[in-house]
Amino acid sequence: MNIQSDGIRIDLVTGSRRISNLGWASVLLLGTSGFLLTGLSSYLGKDLIPFLYPSEEHMKIAFAPQGLVMCFYGIAGLFLSTYLWCAILWNVGGGYNEFDRQEGTITIFRWGFPGQNRRIRIRCLIKDVKAVRIETQTGLLSRNDISILLRDKQRLVFNQLGDSLTLQEIEDKAVQLAQFLQVPLEGV
């Protein structure tokens, strides 16, 4: 989502709060809970998931090899699921890109994990911007990047991970950004 007025342009960045991340975290939580409950059922000798397993004796799982491995996978998956849910809750990677012609600054803000560097803010001057650049890579892992080249040879990448934009959409965004910053466009 873009917000633009006369001298300010703000591009909002989604971060971890994506539908795909919510789906993966939910599936992982449910799946690993099933693994853990199955392993604990084999250890306790009781059906903790009675609607899933029939009460026949030949369907019981021995704890020694299978139940232990199921518990291990369940615990490991719960840790991974907790990590994903925390990243979603804290909106890691979310933030904004602000281009302010009135003050002459570019601000990149992202949320990180809690701690000393929770707020990540990078500021630079618009007068230090040399050009807006489009970089394309084709092949198995193809990607299109919009970046800003600074005079000191640094490169700031602005497109989001997970954005599946066509080359035309990437070019349109880059042209709009170059026009707003009043700098040349490279790599078209």
Curated annotation (Swiss-Prot):
Subcellular compartments: Plastid, Chloroplast thylakoid membrane
Membrane topology of this protein: Multi-pass membrane protein
Main location: plastid
GO CC annotations on file: chloroplast thylakoid membrane; photosystem I
GO biological process assignments: photosynthesis
Keywords assigned by UniProt, alphabetized: Chloroplast, Membrane, Photosynthesis, Plastid, Thylakoid, Transmembrane, Transmembrane helix
Name of the molecule in the record: Photosystem I assembly protein Ycf4
Family from the record: Belongs to the Ycf4 family.
The protein's role, per its UniProt record: Seems to be required for the assembly of the photosystem I complex.
Top-level taxon in the UniProt lineage: Eukaryota
InterPro entries registered for this protein in UniProt: PSI_Ycf4_assembly
Transmembrane segments: 22-42, 68-88
Pfam families documented for this protein: Ycf4
Database matches in HAMAP family: Ycf4 (MF_00437)
